Amino acid sequence: MKNRLVDYFISLVKIDSESKNELAMAERMRDDLMKMGAQVIFDDAHARTKGNIGNLIARFPGKVEKKPLLFCAHLDTVKPGKGIKPVIKNGKIFSDGTTILGTDDKSGIAEIVEAIRRLQEEHFDYAPIEVLLTISEEIGLLGAKNLDYSLLNAKVGYALDSHRIGSATIQAPSLNVIEIKVIGKEAHSGACPERGINAIELAAEAISKLKLGRIDKETTANIGKINGGVANNIIPNIVSLSGEVRSHSEEKLEKVTNEIIRTFEETAQKYQINLDGKVYKAKVDIKVDRDFPAMKIDSNEQIVQIALKAAKNINIEPKVEISGGGSDANIFYSKGIKVPILGTGMRDVHTLDENISIEDLENGTRWIMEIIKEYSKM
Ligand SMILES: [Zn+2]
């Protein structure tokens, strides 16, 4: 049986597009979207992200007077994503087991494109639509962070980049990455231990005082990496650690981050020695990077309600969700663009078992069509 949607999805996953190498995929999408009547432009984000093509922005003129509706997805995939050979088994599409499938996020792209194609074939009078396909989402939301926002006119829309069809993610936490360097003083551990300041000991004491893991319903903290020491007979003078704090509340994010900084600084003050009339003090260098800001869209917002109503219209159970991770949508939110993240049917993403059912591809497409119809009729 010939199925345009399935054939299209399969043709897209066969195009290699690991992060920073999205050129072939971007050119394919430019050609396809232009054939459908869109104006397509690229920004120059790749000049800053060191990729081989920028973000793609496509504009479909509307057939009714309305503000444009945005649909976003990302062009890149995680590794191993080269030479993907899709296989259909029992109504589901898998890779051959040696690579990921790339349904994250090509299911989103295929569903957006097929939905618009079908609406055009139905001669439906839709609102103006903008399609934004970003680069290098998987390696730190680089495309979204470096996007030329002057090229976007839409202020609301959807990112197709989640799992279950019918679910709309409307909240996601902010994330701080914390890098800590503890500096002690080196000395021979057998001959003159009193001349050293043990950075490992200091780090261990500070960590033992931290509250890690789940802090509360909205907040988590983790020390994820630690590195230090040279040899058993040397008192170590440097330990590097890194960790993160996530929270749905900016206030709590700041509070927990500051707590970690304060604990290291206070612990370091206890570590000092007096040598030959000179005082040696331990030091801590701490760097905090805001990786992404929180997203908090109210479930009563029209853009959320449209997605839920559209799901109901096609007999799919609607659901709002809160995520523990960040995505392009966090960055858009900080720029004043509200995009709930919708499920596309992708499963077991970022693994060799990644898959999607043909039924979900179809339902995802129908959901997007219904959303555009609801929005356009409003
Ligand atoms: Zn994704």
Question: What residue ranges belong to the model's regions?
Answer:
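N-terminal capping segment at the start of a domain
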Residues: 1-23, 290, 349-351
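A non-catalytic alpha/beta surface segment that caps or lines the substrate-entry region
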Residues: 18-65
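Active-site metal-coordination/substrate-binding segment of hydrolases
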Residues: 26, 51-52, 59, 65-128, ...
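Acidic, glycine-rich active-site loops and adjacent beta-strand->loop/helix elements
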Residues: 46, 75-77, 132-140, 162-164, ...
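Glycine/charged-rich beta-loop-alpha catalytic/anionic-binding loops adjacent to active sites
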Residues: 88-100, 183-187, 314, 346-349
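Acidic/histidine-rich catalytic neighborhood of metal-dependent amide-processing enzymes
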Residues: 99-173, 215, 232-233, 241-244, ...
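Metal-dependent amide/peptide-bond hydrolase catalytic core
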Residues: 199-378
